[in-house]
A protein has these predicted regions:
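Glycine-aromatic micro-motifs
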Residues: 1-165
């Protein structure tokens, strides 16, 4: 039974949800994913979390130890390989830096707003882990800004309105 490490940055931060989905998974520690930002993509309404490279940004994560049965359950939940792909990302933990498996959204899907229940699940995970929810709230705001820019690019608006979040 080969175990591996997996990082959660979205709804899988919620330990109650993970206990139901992956009963043998265990939290190892928290960490930081430097050089990435949290965003919401997939649809304008009901978007889901992903991380994308961005110099200077960082995303708090939980590092989980998972077994093959947990990984199969995560594959189903994450829509692997169609919605998410598996990627090894460099995570900084107290014990140092290490490449850890993460699910990262495939393709260029549209930006959007997460469903309230999905957002609340992530917020609960942030609170339980002691993470600053400012990162989560900034991710929602940035995703909304990008969604609106996709619908009506700022240069086409000629300054006729200004969005403030």
């Amino acid at each position: 039974m080969k175990e591996k490490l997996y990082i959660a940055y979205g709804s899988n931060l919620d330990q109650r949800q993970m206990a139901r989905r992956c009963p043998t998974a265990e939290v190892v520690c928290s960490g930081m994913l430097y050089g990435h930002e949290l965003l919401f993509r997939g649809s304008q309404f009901g978007a889901v979390a992903t991380v994308e490279p961005k110099p200077g940004a960082c995303v708090p994560v939980l590092v989980w130890k998972i077994r093959p049965s947990d990984e199969r359950a995560l594959d189903l939940y994450e829509g692997y390989p169609h919605l998410y792909r598996k990627e090894n990302l460099s995570v900084t933990m107290d014990s140092g830096e290490r490449d850890v498996m993460a699910y990262v959204m495939t393709g260029e899907r549209e930006y959007g707003v997460p469903a309230r229940s999905y957002y609340e699940t992530i917020a609960r995970g942030y609170a339980d882990a002691g993470f600053d929810t400012g990162v989560l709230n900034e991710a929602v705001q940035e995703s909304v800004r990008r969604m609106l820019n996709e619908v009506a690019p700022e240069e086409e608006l000629n300054g006729t309105w200004q969005m403030t979040l």
